[in-house]
Amino acid sequence: MAHQTSCASYTSGRVGLSSATAVVADAAGREQTQHGSPLFPIACYAEDLSCYSVAWHWHEEFEFILAALGPIHVDVNKTRLTLQTGQGVFINSGALHAVEPAEGRALLHSGVFQPRLVGGMDTVF
């Protein structure tokens, strides 16, 4: 028998959850959540998209999204991607994006992190 996980126990790390969205954004669509801390600016999330979708938003951080149980639709700017279980996508800094289940139960894992973790600060790279 498959283990059933409730939305409340599977969803971790998001603030402002509602039945419609897992993102708190300003009028321009910029996400207001701080991911990680100033000393370690990275956060990882596990989300059950059966309970809500992730509304259109953007942020300065990079984001990796992995379909832990798919399929899931990931919309980035004007492109819709459908990720099957085990597939992932990289979302660049400043890219407008949204996520929703394609059908049935859908779970995702994501990592959101500052670009300086990859390129450093005050460098030419």
Identify what each model region corresponds to:
Residues 1-82, 87, 95:
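Generic protein-terminus/edge-of-domain signal
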Residues 94-124:
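Ligand-binding loop in jelly-roll beta-barrel domains
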